[in-house]
Amino acid sequence: MADQSGNAAPPPVRRRSSANYRAYATEPHAKKKSKISASRKLQLKTLMLQIAKQELEREAVERRGEKGRALSTRCQPLELAGLGFEELQDLCRQLHARVDKVDEERYDVEAKVTKNITEIADLNQKIFDLRGKFKRPTLRRVRISADAMMQALLGTRAKETLDLRAHLKQVKKEDTEKENREVGDWRKNIDALSGMEGRKKKFEG
């Protein structure tokens, strides 16, 4: 159907059915070609692995060198040639004193590290408290009535504004018993109205 300007109206857009959409989603589509070829990617990965391996080897060599230098400065070789018995005893006493000193230093360092760890934990806890990220306690489920809930929400106005029982229809027990007495036995009422009550007594007698 053409509009007033003479141009043809575009065809209505047809919605894909579920089967067609499923087929369209599962069928293979042409993938975009990447700018780097597969062989180039493999070459780059291999080069990166080689560089990482060289860096690890260099770090290991540096660690071994630092360890050797530290041991050479702290553990000097002993000169035991030409020493007598008393001199050897003096050397042993010196070595024991040095060991005791190193143990004291190690103990002091461990105490400082423990103190720093405790202070860091306290500071982190203070930060969490300031941000409000404290551990919430587990809440217990408490049963509460509707009146208590409304009173907690509205305060003293709860009883004045909302009285849920006042809108309910009240049925008295006396009214129900009165209705039952008025209805009685429906068969007797029908016999009395139709005049069949006397004839029924003759047949029964």
From Swiss-Prot:
Modified residues (N-acetylalanine): A2
SUPFAM superfamilies, alphabetized: Troponin coil-coiled subunits
Modification type Phosphothreonine: residues: T26, T46, T73, T138, T176
Pfam families membership: Troponin, Troponin-I_N
Annotated site residue numbers, Involved in TNI-TNT interactions: C75, C92
Gene Ontology BP annotations: cardiac muscle contraction; skeletal muscle contraction
Positions of the UniProt region annotated as Involved in binding TNC: 27-74
GO molecular function: actin binding
Keywords assigned by UniProt, alphabetized: Acetylation, Actin-binding, Muscle protein, Phosphoprotein
Residues covered by region (Involved in binding TNC and actin): 124-145
Post-translational modification: Phosphorylated at Ser-17 and Ser-18 by PRKD1; phosphorylation reduces myofilament calcium sensitivity. Phosphorylated preferentially at Thr-26. Phosphorylation by STK4/MST1 alters its binding affinity to TNNC1 (cardiac Tn-C) and TNNT2 (cardiac Tn-T). Phosphorylated at Ser-37 and Ser-39 by PRKCE; phosphorylation increases myocardium contractile dysfunction.
Phosphoserine PTM sites in chain numbering: S5, S17, S18, S37, S39, S72, S145, S194
Phosphotyrosine PTM positions: Y21
Region (Disordered): 1-38
Keyword Acetylation carried by entry: yes
Source domain of life: Eukaryota
GO cellular component: troponin complex
Family: Belongs to the troponin I family.
Annotated function: Troponin I is the inhibitory subunit of troponin, the thin filament regulatory complex which confers calcium-sensitivity to striated muscle actomyosin ATPase activity.
Assembly information from the UniProt record: Binds to actin and tropomyosin. Interacts with TRIM63. Interacts with STK4/MST1.
Protein name: Troponin I, cardiac muscle
Taxonomic source organism: Equus caballus (Horse)
The encoding gene: TNNI3
